[in-house]
């Protein structure tokens, strides 16, 4: 409960994103690694290895979490045959997932499935063919994020500057989500785990801390809080272990009373988190994305080019290519000036519009406001 209703976790459960799915699978793999460390269950080791492959196939940033799982498995000597078989399956899962990327990219390009190709935009734009991974450079860029330097981030991960940045970025929110001394309780619980099984405990700490440090340090990350999901999970585990030890220590005579008191205290924290995050209930009925799509459909001509930055282009692309509600309109994910030189050519065959909060400044062009609301839609016209 303390994990599920933490604001940072709950918020990321309200929308579709690959990262929480990858996190859940990776956390399952780490849990099985800890089970192997504590009990020597070879089936847990094999299943966890395959799950680790699935996690990397879903989202390659899960390797930051899985590092902790690898450390936990070192508590026992690996059974060579079991590890070899499960690792082979995991590698096949990863290869199959990543082989799909260039194959699909090549198909989209050959069949001109991406509508932006008709505008003369080179392959590699979001939604249909992000980074154009059918080329080696595009594949490396998409999978490894090479244009943003993740390697440089990893090199400085444990430096004092990154530690301070992580504390500044996540400290206040974590403290708000885990009040009334729960962080201290969690540390005590993790201390018990490390005392009982050092490598398993260290692995859990690494699984929690390494992704959070990366999220704080990576310059291209727009949503660093998604990297702290494992941190919240391990905090919840620490609280659970400490609660269990408390019940065992003080409940020898009246275990039901001790259990009831501990559960009541945790329930108070969970209720507080629910009240604190009550506004998140309204997110399921948030109409902003659908209203933007409706405004674009109502006030632009079929076949229009709709240029929008990422935050609004994603909603419009879903409206256009999933809901099929925008007809032949072409959604271009770009800043208003990014294709300034191409606008004249596009305007010969299309109405060209910009989604913007306020009239965009486009040298050589004027704009005509088509809609109200937030954001607005503007038509580009020649001066």
Question: What is each residue range found by the language model?
Answer:
Residues 174-199:
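Hydrophobic, aromatic-rich transmembrane alpha-helices
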Residues 307-310, 322-383:
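Luminal/periplasmic acceptor-recognition loop/helix of membrane-associated glycosyltransferases
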């Amino acid at each position: 409960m303390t994990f599920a209703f933490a604001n940072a976790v709950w918020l990321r459960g309200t929308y579709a994103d690959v990262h929480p799915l990858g996190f859940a699978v990776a956390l399952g793999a780490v849990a099985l690694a800890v089970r192997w460390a504590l009990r020597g269950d070879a089936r847990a080791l094999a299943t966890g290895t395959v799950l680790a492959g699935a996690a990397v196939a879903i989202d390659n940033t899960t390797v930051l979490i899985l590092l902790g799982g690898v450390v936990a498995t070192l508590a026992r000597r690996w059974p060579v045959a079991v590890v070899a078989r499960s690792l082979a399956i995991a590698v096949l899962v990863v290869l199959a997932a990543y082989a799909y990327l260039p194959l699909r990219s090549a198909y989209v390009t050959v069949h001109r499935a991406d509508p932006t190709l008709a505008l003369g935009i080179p392959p590699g734009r979001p939604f249909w063919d992000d980074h154009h991974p059918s080329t080696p450079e595009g594949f490396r860029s998409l999978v490894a994020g090479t244009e943003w330097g993740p390697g440089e981030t990893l090199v400085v991960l444990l430096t004092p500057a990154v530690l301070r940045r992580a504390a500044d970025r996540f400290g206040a929110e974590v403290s708000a989500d885990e009040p009334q001394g729960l962080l201290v309780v969690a540390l005590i619980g993790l201390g018990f785990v490390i005392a009982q099984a050092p490598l398993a405990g260290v692995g859990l700490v690494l699984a929690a801390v390494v992704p959070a440090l990366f999220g704080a340090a990576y310059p291209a990350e727009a949503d660093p809080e998604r990297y702290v999901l494992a941190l919240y999970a391990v905090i919840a585990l620490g609280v659970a272990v400490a609660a269990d030890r408390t019940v065992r220590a003080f409940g020898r005579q009246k275990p039901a009373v001790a259990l009831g008191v501990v559960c009541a205290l945790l329930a108070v924290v969970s209720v507080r988190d629910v009240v604190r995050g009550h506004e998140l209930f309204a997110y399921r009925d948030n109409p902003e994305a659908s209203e933007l799509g409706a405004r674009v459909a109502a006030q632009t001509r079929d076949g229009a080019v709709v240029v929008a930055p990422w935050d609004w282009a994603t909603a419009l692309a879903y409206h256009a290519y999933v809901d099929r509600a925008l007809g032949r309109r072409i959604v271009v994910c770009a800043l208003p000036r990014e294709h300034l030189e191409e606008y004249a050519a596009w305007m010969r065959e299309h109405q060209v519009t910009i989604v913007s909060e306020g009239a965009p400044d486009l040298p050589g062009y004027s704009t005509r406001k088509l809609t109200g609301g937030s954001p607005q839609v503007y038509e580009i016209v020649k001066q």
